[in-house]
Amino acid sequence: MSAPNQFFATAATLLAIATGAGACAHTDYFPGTTILRNEENIKIIETVEQYRRRMLEHNVDGLLVLASSTYFEDSGTPRSDDDYGYEGLKQVLSSKLKLVKSLRYEIEYRNITVRGNRADVEVFLDGSFELAAEAGDRYRRLNDYHQFVLERENEQWKFVRGM
């Protein structure tokens, strides 16, 4: 083979290898989702999973560490008397979690949207719990779509709504 033909054959082989390698590259997603597996989304999901584990442990102090000092919950109603901030979150968690005798709580991640230092995490909650009550224990199920809102504070993601 002449030198020019050998050059073109080598170049064509290298081009085919490079093109083939590029074609094998793929975007990495969290299993069973269309959520990109990148450093930011990993940190966000790790934060939400810490929340889920601490709920299962009834760990009020651990949950409060995950909440921003600017936390605000409007409870989704037009009334303002059921809205609360960080201090109210302390009271809600303390009073409600001590009534929970058993808890099953799973989170299915649907979407994560990050805009600057804010992340909206769309999930499907699947859970059940047993409440201690004066009239006897009560069982409840939870199956619903939900949204957590987090903000980045000092390189950590903190909940500002949805806990």
What positions do the PLM features span?
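Sec-dependent bacterial lipoprotein signal peptides
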Residues: 1-24
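Short, low-complexity N-terminal intrinsically disordered segments enriched in polar/charged residues
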Residues: 24-57, 65
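Short beta-strand edge/turn micro-motifs at domain boundaries
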Residues: 25-33, 120-122, 138-163
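Extracytoplasmic/secreted proteins, especially bacterial periplasmic and envelope-associated proteins
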Residues: 39, 43-46, 50, 62, ...
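Hydrophobic pocket/interface hotspot
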Residues: 51, 63, 71, 89, ...
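Short, well-ordered alpha-helical segments enriched in acidic and aromatic residues
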Residues: 57-74
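A short gly/proline-enriched turn/hairpin at secondary-structure junctions
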Residues: 72-83
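Surface-exposed, charged secondary-structure patches
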Residues: 90-135
